Amino acid sequence: MAACSVELGVITAGGKVTEQLPFTTAMNISQCRHFAASGLTPLGAAMELALDRLEERTAAYRKAGVAYYQPWLVVISDGVPTDQWQAVSARARSLAQQRKMVVMPVGVEEADLEALSAFSTRPAKRLDGLKFREFFLWLSASMSRVSASASTTEQVRLPPTDSWDSI
């Protein structure tokens, strides 16, 4: 059921901001590309694009009269934002406070967790080593629970994160 409900978009910020994958239904994704960290981290510009895309998507659903679940914006970074990110972090946090989206910040290796946390109403979590597989399994299980919930506004109990996060 989640594969029919979940859409995925990927935007990278390795040196420059690139929309790697426009919103695509999960069941239509047959393989995953590998992304390598490189260059500067224009996280502010990447988040601006991500927020714009999410707002465009939810507006299209509203216009078509389609019910949708609160979108999740997963932000994964391995460093420190290298552009002007403070204004867009306030925008993301405001949208999260208004319950228009969930922002899930995740730090890898030497990521600046304080900067990542500024984008969300919840603190950033640090990925334990390189447990990306465990993280994406957790994310998939979480999305399955959300899409199986009875209502688009219902609070959903998510699985524990101990398989992938470090304390």
Please identify what each model-predicted range represents.
Residues M1, R93-M101:
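Arginine/glycine-rich "motif VI" loop of SF2 helicases in the C-terminal RecA-like domain
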Residues M1-L21, S30-Y69, L73-I76, D83, V102-A115, K131-W138:
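Von Willebrand factor
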Residues S5, Q98-K100, T121:
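A generic structural signal for alpha->beta connector loops
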Residues V10, V103-P105, A124-R126:
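Conserved beta-strand scaffold positions in the cores of enzyme catalytic domains, especially
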Residues L21-N28:
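Short, flexible, mixed-charge acidic loops at enzyme active sites
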Residues Q31, E109-I167:
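Von Willebrand factor A/integrin I-like adhesion domains
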Residues W85-S94:
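Mixed-charge (Asp/Glu-Lys/Arg
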